[in-house]
């Protein structure tokens, strides 16, 4: 659209008065060609609206005013020319009627009565339209769920969360955080709309007339066809019950003010990012652990160092803090809207009270029909949350070094030459470099030390001494041979080659340290000043090297969480398997370091069969190593690997009881876990009814019985509403998490639909418990879940009240728990006082325990339990 300074001008491609007719076009100086006479479907005036070379046949109701005609014209511009639309288009257009009998061909339409049947009305852009008007094009933002990692196009940071992570513009397709909504400039390009501009408004049943005409459509049809294409205002508090919620960018007045500001070059400073961020110039990820890129100190623009020279000089100065929205604009948003936009928690998961999203599957064109059917239910499927990503163990280790090596030992002084291959777990001595047959394996976990050549008593007379020694508990290996004055002797004997093997073995013994922190020249890599804290006997020893006590396997990644990576390991002397959490101090701030120390301090004070055992902690200037007992797997793995994607009631009762008993011990010591979820419930064995232990106390807090805390902790998918709403919370926070764990165990889905407020869903039991699978689950289980998922903390069940619930007080569950206690050799779940009660129960049942209704409830699950046991064994 081009503004006409002195006389009205047509919209794109429109010929003005007195201009020659375009080739093959229409001569507007002569009477227009006879238009097809299509009878109007009802009372009203039918006429053509022409914009450039495009005509649309519309039907105007008889009682309509000129404003209605202008709205139709704006709708056509949005549909046919989205790149030409701008803010305030309605006030900047004029309507002219073609009158071939008049000296002035175009007659200004001043009212709807001026339009007669069959007229041709030209839409013309007024000369009052300014350059700023063309630049202001508001976004039409809707809440969107992303199935792949996405980044905010305003701040460059990743959109975090399971579902509803951010906002997507219906016009240009750009993505934004909800918290960035009020800072987004109104610069929608309409790229997505432009793909639709070649279709007619009545595309479902239209026939093109001439080059650009279509069948008539009524005003209602035209409005409906363009509803989804027009930028919409955010909903007011009175319309909060609508099926969809929309956001717009910053106020138009602010955009006009910023356009008048002088744009200056950016002031870039090197910046370290704590969240994944993309360069806003090239849209590529800023890679690295720290100092990844440059950030403008005024407008916070992020880019690579190499892209800084290509960034235009368009800095608008210091960004407004909480000042982007005037009071009158903020008044249009409900309180729930404001809290959901300003709350940092929205990047981590589902938030009670946040905006809903209608027909999630309909907004994602790339999804298949199968997913659409699943999404129509609206329940979030159970998955491993982003904060605790599980990794599988690689079957084959990476070869670190290989080659021919000469060696002998204190058990056999005969010198041998084998092809050595070093990987992350062992040294394998092959017969040659082409066969799989090997002579010996030396596990790295059995190596106690690698020392320079010291013992020469076994060197045969007249032979060259060895270069270094590998010391294990039973055997000492003497490796290499030092040829006199020949640094590059035969293969496997050269001093340089053997020294390379010594260095490689030292690095393999503690490779996790050396991944990010190369040692200084002349300094032994893994010999660092360290502090060892033994939890079992509370001994603190200085200058203890973890490599002398444990072997860590870097290719056996057990998991990764908030504070670091968990590797498999082995105690060198006893051969006991352990799990080692390795944390790089340089990668997290002091606050998270204090959380780690908090976890260690809590685990030091806990000794319970239902809580993971912490052995010791090692600390170096660069890293922290937390050594714990290694378990078989986690509860989430058991749920996802089951045949139906959920657990039978009998097994769920067995596991939930153990979780509650462990929580009772924690709460007795005034400790609240704060991050309870299936990933943090570990299985001690592959048995179908395993012992479980709680782990990951990084978020745990010391909270008294009647005390409250306000700091935000935990994983949002399992957190209670009071935490997500920044209200005070107490130990009942863990009980909400138990309710969610119980729900996902029995159903395989999270209990909340993403489209409604949690409070509303809890009060609507029919919505929370759909027939599949809850029609096959007992009412007692549903009753316990309802009492755990109580929004009001005072109504939520405690640990003791949950353990006393009839659903858990079942004879078969008691038998399963007693069998587990018999295997463990310790009674810590059940109590002796219950024996008499269950003996009386058996006597009343005529000595046939678990018969009748109890036995009938358990028999159908035998097949499921057998299949689940097989899957756990495979895992």
Swiss-Prot record:
Residue numbers annotated as active site: 675 (proton acceptor)
Protein name (database record): Serine/threonine-protein kinase D2
Listed Low complexity bias regions: 1-12, 236-245
Cofactor annotation: Mg(2+)
Similarity field: Belongs to the protein kinase superfamily. CAMK Ser/Thr protein kinase family. PKD subfamily.
The keyword Transmembrane helix appears for this protein: no
A cellular component term, taken from the record's GO annotations: cytosol
Enzyme class, UniProt record, top EC level: transferase
Disordered: annotated segments: 1-35, 224-247, 332-374
The UniProt record lists the keyword Zinc: yes
Sample GO molecular function, one term: protein kinase C binding
PTM annotation: Phosphorylation of Ser-873 correlates with the activation status of the kinase. Ser-707 is probably phosphorylated by PKC. Phosphorylation at Ser-244 by CSNK1D and CSNK1E promotes nuclear localization and substrate targeting. Phosphorylation at Ser-244, Ser-707 and Ser-711 is required for nuclear localization. Phosphorylated at Tyr-438 by ABL1 in response to oxidative stress. Phosphorylated at Tyr-718 by ABL1 specifically in response to oxidative stress; requires prior phosphorylation at Ser-707 or/and Ser-711.
Function of the molecule: Serine/threonine-protein kinase that converts transient diacylglycerol (DAG) signals into prolonged physiological effects downstream of PKC, and is involved in the regulation of cell proliferation via MAPK1/3 (ERK1/2) signaling, oxidative stress-induced NF-kappa-B activation, inhibition of HDAC7 transcriptional repression, signaling downstream of T-cell antigen receptor (TCR) and cytokine production, and plays a role in Golgi membrane trafficking, angiogenesis, secretory granule release and cell adhesion.
